């Protein structure tokens, strides 16, 4: 049985970790109970019935909806030439369990989860479904505490940069989008070329260039020719989008 002083020490450590997280993301909760609830698993509540704990399941429900909306809004604005089907496919890749687990692990969310002893013993702290749920619950808690702007600020640190870096390019067909745009506006002919191949056979890197009527539009790097061309097309789309705004 834990002594009161031991419990106090554990609580102090936990509070310090929550403060550390808030400092790391630059967002401080007004209602810290919401923050703690986001990390409270139902197994912990079941084992601490004497204390008024609430689990994170309702927050997860809310966070799931908020995440879908914010990611949808970001994609809608960032990729004006992407079809509804392509946007849906990309959003699904971003908010799927494996992606959410990566985002949660990047912030060491697993260390903060309040778990029941049984769940702890069976490795619940590293269970993908649990980590994905906690990430969604955190979004829900942040939305309730500070609103949509704070959620967008948080996603601007965790998810949106990954989209910009091309982490989900495997589900995005930038070449088709670029081809469609060029054909629609009748602005010329696209041509792809491999500028460079470097690295050993097992870890090659390709540099691709896409040109429009002989003029360079974008350069991309990838582990395969196809990936390099996709990244080059992505850069070209961004360039054409910027020109279109001028």
Swiss-Prot record:
Predominant location: cytoplasm
Gene Ontology annotations for the cellular component aspect, listed alphabetically: cytoplasm
Binding positions for Mg(2+) per the UniProt entry: 60, 133, 136
Keyword presence, Electron transport: no
Required co-factors: Mg(2+)
Entry-linked Gene3D superfamilies: 3.30.160.20, Ribonuclease III domain
Catalytic residues, chain numbering: 64, 136
Catalytic function, reaction form: Endonucleolytic cleavage to 5'-phosphomonoester
InterPro entries tied to this protein: dsRBD_dom, RNase_III, RNase_III_dom, RNase_III_sf
Cellular location(s): Cytoplasm
GO molecular function: double-stranded RNA binding; metal ion binding; ribonuclease III activity; rRNA binding
Name of the protein: Ribonuclease 3
Gene: rnc
């Amino acid at each position: 049985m834990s002594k009161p002083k031991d419990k106090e020490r554990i609580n102090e450590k936990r509070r310090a970790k929550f403060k550390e997280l808030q400092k790391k993301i630059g967002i401080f909760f007004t209602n810290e109970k919401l923050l703690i609830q986001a990390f409270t698993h139902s197994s912990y509540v079941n084992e601490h019935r004497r204390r008024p704990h609430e689990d994170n399941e309702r927050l997860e429900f809310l966070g799931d909806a908020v995440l879908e909306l914010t990611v949808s809004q970001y994609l809608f604005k960032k990729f004006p030439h992407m079809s509804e089907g392509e946007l849906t496919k990309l959003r699904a890749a971003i908010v799927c369990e494996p992606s959410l687990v990566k985002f949660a692990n990047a912030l060491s969310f697993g260390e903060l989860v309040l778990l029941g002893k049984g769940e702890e013993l069976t490795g619940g702290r590293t269970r993908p479904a649990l980590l994905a749920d906690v990430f969604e619950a955190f979004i829900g808690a942040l939305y309730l505490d500070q609103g949509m702007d704070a959620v967008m600020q948080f996603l601007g640190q965790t998810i949106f940069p990954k989209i910009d870096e091309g982490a989900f390019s495997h589900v995005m067909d930038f070449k088709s989008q670029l081809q469609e745009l060029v054909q629609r506006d009748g602005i010329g002919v696209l041509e792809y070329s491999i500028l460079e191949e470097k690295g050993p056979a097992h870890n090659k890197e390709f540099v691709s260039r896409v040109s429009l009527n002989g003029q360079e539009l974008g350069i991309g790097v990838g582990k395969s020719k196809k990936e390099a061309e996709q990244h080059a097309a992505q850069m070209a789309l961004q360039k054409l989008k910027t020109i279109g705004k001028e």
